[in-house]
Amino acid sequence: MNFKILTVDFLSENAPKDFVRSLRGTGFAVIKNHPITKSLLDRVYSDWTDFFNSNKKHDYLFHKENQDGYFPYKSENAKGYNSKDLKEFFHIYPWGRYPDIVGEDTLEFYENIQYLGDELLDWIDYASPKHVSKKFSSTLTSMIEDTDQNLLRVINYPPIKDLNTHGEIRAQEHADI
């Protein structure tokens, strides 16, 4: 098995094949020249750092029935584990609540990441071996088309102040996603 993670140029005509080759070899790929700018990422990161450092986050506690909103520190544990993950996070859905102290950059990022995800799924469709793709019930991109269940999970791993974490770790392996 090849364990070389490829760097794939988003703008290259070979991108779909290179991307799938890297996924098949390692399960990963690095994408360069993608449409998400560093300045946008920096602004989003800054907004959410401010949000997680504020008490306003508690105004957006998650709704149990639809899972949107803020999930406090130690609110989740991985399937099959008893210890809590040492993180807090916020689920953003297209129809969900959105913190008033977070700028519009996150919504732009959400749209861009949706586009990027669609494109990568299209590459997998295009470059997958025929014996694999014929088992798909439909194209991968059509499986997520017009769904309101795509979410953006913004995660914060606060500094650990107490080194005695009682077996808790930053994030257990999650096999339920």
What are these regions (language model features)?
Residues 1-177:
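Peripheral, non-catalytic segments flanking oxidoreductase cores
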